[in-house]
């Protein structure tokens, strides 16, 4: 499916860039469809990063400076303006909003235009503002929040990203579809153990 990734570059969010680029690069490698990257403060700056590597994204964004206010809603408003239909949305931000459009109203307009509600994942980095996004919309939108430290590494981002799905209950369905082991399979030692035992004896 198509992914929309928003990275907060408002004044207090200079540390959102690294996890945001790691996330965008991971999705760009993994998904078969498009990845649209939107840097945002009170305005959106949009790039198609489908197929890009982390090194390419770092080079592409080295002149971006964290400054300005915050409008998380402008991410989905920009996607709608570009006629980009996202199957899922990932945001890297502290969840604070100070400028219109607010995320809730922009998301509902975007969803109505597409005829579907894409799941929203917030990678919440530390910031100066309270996490208004979770407080306002956590119970009303298909929404999940991942608290993220300032210094998260690639392995940490990938571990979180691997749980994201383009359907609201995609991970639950994947777990339910996984065949259960029989008692014999569960108690059977791994093949490598049997090889090591045979060599030892």
Question: What are these model-derived regions, one by one?
Answer:
Residues 1-201:
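Acidic, glycine-rich A-domain
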């Amino acid at each position: 499916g198509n992914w929309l990734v928003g990275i907060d570059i408002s004044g207090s969010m200079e540390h959102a860039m690294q996890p945001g680029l790691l996330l965008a690069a991971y999705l760009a490698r993994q998904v078969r469809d498009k990845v649209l990257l939107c840097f945002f403060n009170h305005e959106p700056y949009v790039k198609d990063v489908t197929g890009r590597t982390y090194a390419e994204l770092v080079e592409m964004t080295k002149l971006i400076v964290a400054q300005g206010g915050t409008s998380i809603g402008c991410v989905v408003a920009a996607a709608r303006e570009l006629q980009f239909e996202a199957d899922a949305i990932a945001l890297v931000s502290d969840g604070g909003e100070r400028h219109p459009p607010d995320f809730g109203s922009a998301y509902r307009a975007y969803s109505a235009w597409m005829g579907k509600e894409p799941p929203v994942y917030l990678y919440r980095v530390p910031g100066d503002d309270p996490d208004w996004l979770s407080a306002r919309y956590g119970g009303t939108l298909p929404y999940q929040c991942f608290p993220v430290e300032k210094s998260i590494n690639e392995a940490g981002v990938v571990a979180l990203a691997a749980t994201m799905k383009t359907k609201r209950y995609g991970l639950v369905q994947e777990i339910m579809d996984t065949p259960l082991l029989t008692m014999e399979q569960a108690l059977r030692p791994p093949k490598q153990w049997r090889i090591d035992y045979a060599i030892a004896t």
